[in-house]
Amino acid sequence: MPGSHACDHCRRRKVRCNGADPCSQCSRSGIPCERRTILRRRGPRVAKRPANAESLPQGPRCIDNPEHSVSRDDLLLSVSVSDHGLEGQVAAVHGSPRMSMSSTDSFIHSLAHPPCSVEVTSGSLVRSEFLHVRRRLVSQFNSLQALSGNIEETAHECVDLFMQFLFPNTPIAHEPTLRASIPLLSVDTTPEPTPTENLNPNEPPLIPSLRRFTLITALCAHIISVVPESLSRKPKSVSGIFFEASKSMLRAYEACDLEHPDSTSLTIRMWHSSYAQNTTGKVGASWHYHTEACCLAQRLRLFDEASIARPSLLESQLLRVNFWHLYLAEKTQVAFRSRPPIIDERICDGGITLLDKGNELVPFLDPSREVNQADLESRIFFGFHLRRRMSATAARLIDDIASFSGHVESNSLRANQLNGGDQEMTTLIERYLKFTALVNEVPSWVRHPDRGEDPKVDEQVRTYQATCFWAQRTNIMTIFYCMRLLILQTCIDHGLPAVVGLSESPLSWASRKLEIIQDFLDDLQGTPFICLEAQGETAVGGSRFLTIIQ
């Protein structure tokens, strides 16, 4: 007899069923025609509590409304498992009716928490996230037909460019570690847990591999975004691929990273900040990443020499130089009055006691490379700390000028305070002279990079190192002339031109500005343009400022 309703097969396919037994659709398809589904009345479903509900394990509760629990089926269907490499686990949940309730609850519990909460995420899920992000990165990279070479070759090129053009100004990474991280970009490499003796007990075993993957992809994004295409030979769009991979991987272990930060936590965020600045020219996202790094440095109390010690001498050294680079950036922002500082002597308990150089003697440069000989690293760090002192001295002087001006105005003692014999005025003048004298400390290898002093050094090595010092010289001198103009403008704005040796005549102010600009242009003579171009938005912004303020 004809069936009274559509068969199960037609209902699933949502096609018209003629009600026969077997129906025409099933006959044509050659499949059994069955009617096992129990029809229910249409209308809102009424939830019925099972008789054994008291004995069932409770599912996770909704945070916003604790009166309602999350349905297992809804949760499994709403989670985008393909983004976390969980297809097999979901199939096991749906395809195995004998799966125990406790194992189902355990699986759902892992999905109910954000993937960055590594404390409640199993090692297999962390590994799945790693493999998924890497697979997507390699796929997007290979889809760009214009690229030459594979992804590992590109990463090696980025490390080479960083060490020659940007490491002299931002020596915040360990070259052997960067190069050892490159194989993680290959789909043929399996992330291995850190050996037990080197494992931080506070983090899962795979976290060090995730940190290194995030670090090398952040470096590639940073380099390709900042250096000209004539150097990187890669379109700028490639930097976005690496940045998304780095950002996605950081999210995968972010909770652990924020709870137990290390030197990579700072370096990665600084390179993310640089990428945002160089690709958009906007400071919002860039400032956010930089601020995160500063907050982590403050929480670790890296300003205190007693807090810098780590079991690994390399880690201690990386934390030290990362802090000083953040400090330099903060002082530069203070001088430009672009935002309030996060790292400052006035808000650090006991002041900043961190030494420029500690007892760590681990080289950052790869000693196996011939171009790194002849004390290249020690010379680079000398110039780095000189630039830091320039920014810090200028920032303090600008703050003191503004504070002094506000003090004399509030006390109506302007005539007396501007007396040449006033102690505070004399102190400001002395600090200005101290700042201008810093340019005399620029070493000979930075002042004249092409004049190699060691005849035993190979010509190829000398050329490589000269490029390093040209890049550093460009940065140091740009900072120096920018700070001179900022100090001059601050004195003019606060009615204290005497600090820089000028009268109250606006003509003398304009003449001094032109003099500083001319000195800067003269100083740039002979500088390889590629060294200026490779500094990215920072150098361009400094040069733009020198043009605008005049």
Feature map (PLM): residue ranges:
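C-terminal, low-complexity intrinsically disordered regions in eukaryotic proteins
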Residues: P44, A51-S117, S139, D375, ...
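Intrinsically disordered, low-complexity activation-like regions
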Residues: D21, S27-I38, R61-N169, H222, ...
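TPR repeat positional signature
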Residues: L215-I216, C220, T264-S265, R269, ...
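Long, amphipathic alpha-helical regulatory blocks in the mid-to-C-terminal portion
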Residues: S237-H260, C295-E305, I352-D366, R389-S403, ...
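Amphipathic alpha-helical scaffolding segments
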Residues: S286-C295, V408
